[in-house]
Amino acid sequence: MELIVDFSSDLQTEKYNMFIDTLYENNHLENYIKKVLNLEKIESDRPLYLSLLLTDNENIQVINREYRDKDAPTDVISFAYHETEDFNIGSYDTLGDIIISLERVEEQASEYNHSFEREFYYVLTHGILHILGYDHIEEEDKKLMREREEAILSSFGYTRDK
């Protein structure tokens, strides 16, 4: 499967630079996303495209307010394209956009006593599952989504205590 990850950051601080650099090393981020898509049995004859933006609490709050009518920062916002006409425009299939607040990831890692890395990959996995159609509004759907998150994270060696 060919995957195009449009990865960017609008962070104005160097605080997370080392972590961001590790995402680029050996295509680590792209390989992680590919494996998640493979675990979810996503196939395509055309390249798949995914946009990922790393930001801070202030910027994600603006997006959350504008698109979800929630005036508060959040960890991740996903925009799925599979239900729109924009899904297969051009030479690839667009999965969607994922926006992650690294500040919120750091806060949650501390709150849940996880490593920053584990919390980042949890939030990223959560965002990927949303663009693949998973949701957690209904209790049954929430249970299924949590099971998939834990199974995916476990396949990478990320457990609740790591």
UniProtKB/Swiss-Prot annotation:
Its cofactor is Zn(2+). GO terms for cellular component: cytoplasm. The keyword Cytoplasm applies. Disulfide bonds: none annotated. Its EC number is 3.1.-.-. Zn(2+) binds at H126, H130, H136. Single strand-specific metallo-endoribonuclease involved in late-stage 70S ribosome quality control and in maturation of the 3' terminus of the 16S rRNA. This is Endoribonuclease YbeY. It comes from Fusobacterium nucleatum subsp. nucleatum (strain ATCC 25586 / DSM 15643 / BCRC 10681 / CIP 101130 / JCM 8532 / KCTC 2640 / LMG 13131 / VPI 4355). The lineage of its organism: Bacteria, Fusobacteriati, Fusobacteriota, Fusobacteriia, Fusobacteriales. The gene is ybeY.
